[in-house]
């Protein structure tokens, strides 16, 4: 059941405003001239941007924050905020309306002609691509996503048009609250084992979401969607697939996967639309692009506008984001933290290695540096993680990023031991400092380094880039790597 949201002028206060989902909502509200404040113990560039927009931000989550405000606000929390949080406890004591982040997003979805993108993987890329298409098509959409995009310099933009594009998260079950005009489902797998015990529970949440949508855009290449997702008899379903023989409404052929992107011919219900080009690598991103094509066509965009927009789209931050290169050592930052995502990202890395033949080196390698995210996920998918790194020449594994979990069900060393049964080159370096030291002693010209995970591992990239940029190349080349 949704909690009522007051858009009539009562202030909003976000506990944990610096989070990627919370900050996007705050951005949209303040752009609508609504009073917004928030707190976060870890300030970052996103909170700085909100401060520039006029948001009052408290640097700690303290009970006194609410007393310092001129009017008792509606208090917005995410699932990460627990009942023992002092600011939350004060909000309850003062009688402030308490809203879950999803209540606010659901209310915004109701106020627009909305497209909500759901799925275990690919949500951020697909939703940002759809938002970019609408922007290129002159629609001026409002966009709320779980990643940052250079095209609108952040994780949200507030447009003057009637459309909202939102990323719809399933991690805590709140996906069931959303009722958009168009709902996209990219795929369904078991994830978030801290909330779901089995795949059946995940399917049920997605079914509830699908049956709240006026139209569902669904990937027919996902067997769980195709064979197990049940929608209402009168539900409008638009399907997409990478295979013409699937019978999907949108499909492709003549696919060319390359180190700089992907080309394909797009078909719409048996009619050739034309050629599609994307800078994003791999089959998983071609599926994301095809979902964007389907949504664009539903909204009345011509294929020329759609194909031009997809060709120009650069992607979202931390989604195979090339952070820099020094002496032929390239660093890529990717949010992959589920075994399926890791396999897809490593496959894309293999594609990119093909473009690096200028480095004549017998040890040109794909180096995967991975920080597992959450004990529950690592424990549940221990075997799947162990088998996911087959495309990597070297795997460097850190300890597990807890993301607030306290029950240490499994240790990073245990995962490293299991991984070593399937992979010849696995190095366990528990801390970020140990990872940096190891990589400084190991990387060589021609290496493609994929920094993988949803935690803080990507913080190592700037120091490593600086280190290699200052070293003479002959010094790097003297030592033969593992």
Curated annotation (Swiss-Prot):
GO molecular function: ATP binding; UDP-N-acetylmuramate-L-alanine ligase activity
Record has Cytoplasm as a keyword: yes
Pathways per UniProt: Cell wall biogenesis; peptidoglycan biosynthesis
The organism's place on the tree of life at top rank: Bacteria
A GO BP annotation: regulation of cell shape
EC number, as in UniProt: 6.3.2.8
Positions that bind ATP: 119-125
SUPFAM superfamilies listed in its UniProt record: MurCD N-terminal domain, MurD-like peptide ligases, catalytic domain, MurD-like peptide ligases, peptide-binding domain
Primary site of residence: cytoplasm
UniProt enzyme class: ligase
Keywords: ATP-binding, Cell cycle, Cell division, Cell shape, Cell wall biogenesis/degradation, Cytoplasm, Ligase, Nucleotide-binding, Peptidoglycan synthesis
Catalysed reaction, written as an equation: UDP-N-acetyl-alpha-D-muramate + L-alanine + ATP = UDP-N-acetyl-alpha-D-muramoyl-L-alanine + ADP + phosphate + H(+)
Record bears the keyword ATP-binding: yes
Function: Cell wall formation.
NCBIfam families noted in UniProt: murC (TIGR01082)
Family membership noted in the UniProt record: Belongs to the MurCDEF family.
HAMAP family the UniProt entry points to: MurC (MF_00046)
Name of protein: UDP-N-acetylmuramate--L-alanine ligase
Organism the protein comes from: Cyanothece sp. (strain PCC 7425 / ATCC 29141)
Gene symbol of the encoding locus: murC
């Amino acid at each position: 059941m949704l909690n009522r949201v007051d858009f009539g002028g009562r202030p909003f206060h976000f506990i944990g405003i610096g989070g990627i989902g919370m900050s996007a909502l705050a951005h949209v509200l303040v752009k609508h001239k609504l009073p917004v404040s928030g707190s976060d113990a870890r300030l970052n560039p996103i909170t700085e941007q909100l401060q520039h927009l006029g948001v009052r931000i408290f640097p700690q989550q303290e009970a006194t924050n609410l007393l310092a405000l001129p009017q008792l606000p509606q208090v917005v929390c995410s699932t990460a905020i627990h009942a023992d949080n002092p600011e939350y406890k004060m909000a309850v004591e003062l009688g402030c309306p308490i809203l879950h982040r999803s209540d606010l997003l659901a209310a915004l979805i109701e106020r627009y002609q909305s497209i909500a993108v759901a799925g275990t993987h690919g949500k951020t890329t697909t939703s940002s691509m759809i938002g970019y298409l609408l922007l290129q098509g002159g629609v001026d959409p409002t966009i709320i996503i779980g990643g940052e995009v250079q095209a609108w310099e952040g994780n949200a933009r507030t447009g003057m048009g009637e459309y909202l594009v939102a990323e719809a998260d399933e991690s805590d079950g709140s996906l069931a609250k959303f009722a958009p005009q168009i709902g996209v489902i990219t795929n369904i797998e078991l994830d978030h084992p801290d909330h779901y015990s089995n795949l059946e529970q995940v399917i049920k949440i997605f079914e509830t979401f699908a049956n709240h949508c006026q139209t569902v855009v669904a990937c027919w290449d996902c067997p769980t969607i195709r064979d197990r997702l049940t929608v209402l008899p009168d539900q409008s379903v638009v399907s997409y697939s990478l295979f013409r023989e699937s019978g999907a409404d949108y499909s492709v052929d003549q696919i060319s996967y390359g180190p700089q992107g992907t080309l394909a011919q797009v078909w719409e219900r048996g009619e050739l639309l034309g050629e599609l080009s994307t800078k994003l690598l791999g089959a998983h991103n071609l599926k994301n692009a095809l979902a964007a094509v389907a949504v664009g066509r539903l909204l009345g965009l011509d294929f020329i506008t759609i194909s031009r927009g997809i060709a120009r789209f650069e992607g979202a931050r931390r989604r195979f984001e090339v952070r820099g290169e020094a002496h032929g050592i390239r660093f890529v930052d990717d949010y992959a933290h589920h075994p399926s995502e890791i396999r897809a990202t490593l496959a894309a890395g293999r594609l990119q290695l093909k473009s690096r033949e200028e480095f004549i080196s017998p040890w040109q390698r794909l180096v995967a540096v991975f920080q597992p995210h959450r004990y529950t996920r690592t424990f549940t998918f221990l075997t799947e993680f162990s088998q996911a790194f087959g495309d990597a020449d070297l795997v460097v594994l850190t300890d597990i990023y807890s993301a607030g979990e306290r029950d240490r069900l499994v240790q990073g060393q245990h995962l490293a031991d299991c991984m070593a049964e399937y992979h010849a080159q696995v190095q366990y370096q528990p801390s970020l400092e140990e990872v940096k030291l190891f990589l400084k002693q190991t990387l060589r010209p021609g290496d493609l380094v994929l920094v993988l995970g949803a935690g803080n591992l990507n913080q190592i990239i700037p120091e490593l880039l600086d280190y290699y940029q200052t070293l003479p190349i002959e010094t790097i080349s003297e030592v033969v790597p593992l």
